[in-house]
A protein has these predicted regions:
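Conserved short alpha-helical segments that host acidic/polar catalytic motifs at enzyme active sites
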Residues: 27-217
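Low-complexity, intrinsically disordered or signal/transmembrane-proximal segments
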Residues: 1-3, 23
Length: 217
């Protein structure tokens, strides 16, 4: 019976689940260009479940030890993206059942945030939500970009306006500045620009993308 319970609760064997948490890279050193944010966050994604937001809520509970500063969930209901986020623990952010019930749809991404600096501001709580004339996008990120400072400076010179002090936004701005024809190629090109350890979840109206750094962060 004990073995059956363990097998039933093994997340990797359940299709549709994309749990990512940060793993420490022991025995290796890295020269950091900037240490403005040292995030130890947790991200969770699911696609094709009738109660995607509810499952993500429990997924974030299991990742609560990864971050206690803030939490949020973004859902996808037939191409319509909706989000709820706030400062505090998962149970505090979603203490009103209506906030979770309003996140309808069969896909969702979630994030619990921890940061040693950068300010306890709701602007830094993920998932981030971007709405443009031609697309909507949700973004959740765990990691530390070692070239964040230079990329941010480059993007600001091109006219990008950042709404948070987190380096998470950098990927979105790189995607928007890319001259590749389709979104997947834009994403691939942008991921080649960022350096460091990272895990991303990117929600589009019709797809959910997951990206991991080349070193297996």
């Amino acid at each position: 019976q004990e073995q059956a319970i363990k097998k039933e609760s093994a997340w990797p064997e359940r299709p549709g689940f994309l749990p990512f948490t940060r793993q420490k890279n022991l025995g290796k050193t890295m020269t950091y260009e900037v240490k403005s944010l040292n995030e130890e966050c947790g991200i969770f994604g699911i696609w094709g479940h009738s109660q995607a937001a509810q499952v993500t809520y429990f997924g974030l509970h299991s990742l609560q030890h990864r971050g206690q500063e803030g939490a949020g969930i973004l859902s996808n209901d037939h191409g319509k993206l909706k989000r709820h986020r706030d400062l505090g623990l998962v149970a505090e952010v979603f203490k009103n059942p209506a906030d979770l019930d309003n996140l309808t749809g069969e896909a969702a991404i979630g994030h619990v945030r921890y940061a040693t600096s950068g300010g306890a501001s709701i602007n830094n709580v993920q998932p981030f939500f971007f709405s443009f004339y031609d697309m909507q996008m949700g973004l959740a990120h765990n990691g530390n970009l070692t070239n964040a400072h230079s990329l941010r400076r480059e993007l600001e010179k091109k006219g990008s306006i950042f709404a948070s002090s987190s380096d998470t936004e950098i990927l979105m701005h790189l995607i928007r500045h890319s001259e590749q024809e389709n979104f997947l190629d834009k994403l691939k090109e942008s991921l080649r620009r960022v350096q460091g350890g990272f895990a991303y979840l990117i929600m589009r109206e019709d797809k959910l993308y997951a990206a991991l750094d080349p070193n297996g962060f």
